[in-house]
Amino acid sequence: MARKTALAHGKTYTRGEMGGYMIGMFGQNLIYQIVNTGLYFYFQNVICLPAMALGWIFMLARVWDAVNDPIMGTFVDRTHTRWGKCRPYLIFGPPVIMVVTIAAFLNSNYADATTTSGRIAIIAWAGISYILWGMTYTVCDIPLWGLTSVMTEDESDRAKALSLARIAAGFAGVGVMIVQVAQAVGSTFEASGLSHSEAQRRGFIVTAIGFTVLSTILFEFAGLFTKERVAGSEEHYTVKENFRIMWKNLPFRQILISGILRSPIQLLLINAMTVVTYYYANGDIMNVFGKNGLNKGILINMVLIGGMMFVGNFLGMGIMPGLMKRFEKKNLYNFATLVGALPYAFMFVLYLMAGGDVKPLVWGIPFSVCIFLSGAAQGALNVLQSVMIADCVDYEEYTNGIRTDGVFFSGQSFITKLSSGIAALISSAVFGYVGYSGANVDKLNDALHAGADFLTYDGGTGAGKYAAAMMFLISIPPAIGMALAAIPTWKYALSDAEHTRILDELVARRAAAEAGEEAPAVPEVPAE
């Protein structure tokens, strides 16, 4: 068991500041869910963009965002104001994100476009608005996570802050409900005489505006009600130098590569509402309120699938702080990736064993258990990744005298965004292969609205192919990605004992610098 005796320090956040930070984190991640789940669903299933166009929009935007992250990290580390280096972006940035988020939903139905120029304009607006959203989101995302490193010097408090931040972000998963709410709002427009497709489009626009305004108000708490306590490096570095700093940091490089390898786990997140809406609710969440009353089958499956995912995620995040005090973070990380691959793979096995229909409870219950376990693994990895990246910041300061919090936490955003882009491209390739794309989706929506069954629907490539594609996407690629993710971190370069020694010495250095003395050396920990 690693030594866990880091010094306790007075420079740390108050309970009120932590509360403000968590509210802000919730608001920021609510916006992320509005776009990552709601906008993706809107582009794919409401305005019916072609599958490959959608995939390339998300992929190129995410790659561009990922490259922008270290650039933004450089700006953060060069920022010195009376509010600190992170808080200014969190005070003034959220309203800009709000405007761009709403603008992304103000688009037309691709299937209704009658001219080539009209179709090009719809795709172009989708691409431009999404790229702009990613750029504005980055301006606040890097400072928000970097704030945890400058709010406290205490290792335990920082780990606690990161864990609570991940939990707050997890609660923001309720943002996926934008799809259900939007479809409900859309049904009221349909009742007034609009076509089904136009009613759904307007329902999403109205709902997106409401969700985004609320999220922005909450997001502001992180900038307004926190305080920075740890000074950054006095030296400034170019973007190129910061890329070099990140890449030369061996433990960070291992985390970065591992995070990219497990990119396919994002497939479950970006396709979750598509699966719930089409596979379980036959294309419209409002089908839970059937003609003969409440459809208990749909409701139970929605609760099982959605509920178990969130419960598993929260459990994984919630138990990590305690487990990190008892076990090596590297071992916990590798365990979560390898064991976490199994429930993903078993989901597709259950789908095949059930003959393509896992809605009956005899299959639905074990399927939901797999969802629960995959959510727990993902929640655990989210916390571990954040804490391990924070450790890398200390490692860099100790090794080279450089503390670039913004740059290193931009790496976390880099992983998330690039992973989402890769997942979107994989998703679009599979959906494009089975024909779930463009006008075909519009035809599917009309057919389901007229009474067709999604599980047996034939869009031209074979009955049930759409359903099979969805189940494949949320299971097999994520299983492969999770298994591969353990390879880079199998021999992780920064043990917990060594990090504790490093942090103790850094605190001693800072205290000595303030007193004008030379810091005493902390004995090195023998390599394990």
Model-derived segments and spans:
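Membrane-embedded alpha-helical bundles of multi-pass transporters/translocases
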Residues: 2-528
